[in-house]
Swiss-Prot record:
Key words of the record: Ribonucleoprotein, Ribosomal protein, RNA-binding, rRNA-binding
Function, as annotated: This protein binds to the 23S rRNA, and is important in its secondary structure. It is located near the subunit interface in the base of the L7/L12 stalk, and near the tRNA binding site of the peptidyltransferase center.
Official protein name in the record: Large ribosomal subunit protein uL6
GO cellular component: cytosolic large ribosomal subunit
Database matches in HAMAP family: Ribosomal_uL6_B
Pfam families for this protein: Ribosomal_L6
Keyword Glycosyltransferase: no
Gene for this chain: rplF
One Gene Ontology term from the biological process aspect of the record: cytoplasmic translation
């Protein structure tokens, strides 16, 4: 039995959870999310808690897979409950001379030192806001109820100009430490 999977998930006020045909649907003030759950895992909703247990009758190729599924689906359902009740936020920082970001609705325009600007169409579930103050690095603020989708969008934006180790220029998460390298040593033989 998975240690993470054993923990029950408490359902906060204003959130409703339904189970139909191995699909868990969570509705809350921030939105609605659905997740398919493998038949090897049983889902029970009772007394304001969601509990996931391993189905002893389920046959899988590898018995260890059932333990892995137990922890995986518990984490996915927990992320859905937190997402629809509180939401998830991530901040990206653009470090570099002339790096800019602006948004029109759900389209981000990035100026990252290339000969052309980059336009990124975001999914409707992700809300975006850009901040740029004088003498500070521009910020991209992203918010969504779907943690997985938010991570994918942030990763896609970051992939256009990953931070480089010599000067630290690029797109990074706020608070992320970039491992720096020293340049060429002068006169090294």
């Amino acid at each position: 039995m998975s240690r993470i999977g054993k923990l029950p998930i408490s359902i906060p006020a204003g959130v409703t959870v339904t189970l139909k045909d191995d699909v868990v649907t969570v509705k809350g003030p921030k939105g609605e999310l659905s997740q398919y759950v493998n038949p090897a895992i049983n889902v029970a909703i009772e007394d304001g808690h969601i509990t996931l247990t391993e189905n002893e009758n389920a046959m899988l190729d590898n018995p260890k897979q059932k333990h892995a599924f137990h922890g995986l689906y518990r984490s996915l359902v927990h992320n859905m409950v937190v997402g629809v009740s509180e939401g998830y936020k991530k901040e990206l920082e653009l470090v570099g001379v002339g790096y800019r970001a602006s948004n029109q609705g759900n389209i981000i325009e990035l100026a990252l030192g290339y000969t052309h600007n980059i336009f990124i169409q975001l999914p409707p579930e992700v809300k975006v806001e850009t901040k740029s103050e004088r003498n500070k690095n521009p910020l991209i603020l992203l918010e969504s109820c779907d943690k997985q989708l938010l991570g994918q969008v942030c990763s896609k934006i970051r992939s256009f100009r990953k931070p480089e180790p010599y000067k630290g220029k690029g797109i990074k998460f706020v608070g992320e430490e970039i491992r720096r390298k020293s340049g060429k040593s002068a006169g090294a033989k």
